[in-house]
A protein has these predicted regions:
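Positively charged, polar, low-complexity stretches
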Residues: 1-92
């Protein structure tokens, strides 16, 4: 688990990122989950842009967290940032 100070640092880093994955009104088909998995494996910290209402976005974020073992770093409007450490690697 990330501490609140670690999340704060990651949120700052995430501000400079562009969304890597866009989740449209079709939701989270397996292909989108695979794309998120791939982006997390490559970059550790990613941004995802959602198209939907607030409740639907919250459900999608929960599903992403469950399926990818990532951690939510922050959410602003329709964009959320996720972080996942690489296997065997620890954050400084």
């Amino acid at each position: 688990m990330l501490s609140s100070s670690e999340k704060k640092v990651l949120r700052g880093e995430a501000q400079l990122l562009r969304p890597r994955v866009k989740v449209g009104k079709q939701g989270l088909p397996e292909g989108v989950i695979e794309e998120i998995e791939s982006a997390l494996s490559r970059d550790k910290l990613i941004k995802v842009r959602f198209e939907g209402d607030r409740d639907q976005i919250t459900e999608w974020i929960t599903e992403i967290l469950e399926k990818t073992a990532a951690q939510l770093v922050g959410r602003v409007g329709k964009t959320a940032s996720f972080y996942r450490e690489k296997e065997g690697e620890e954050r400084e």
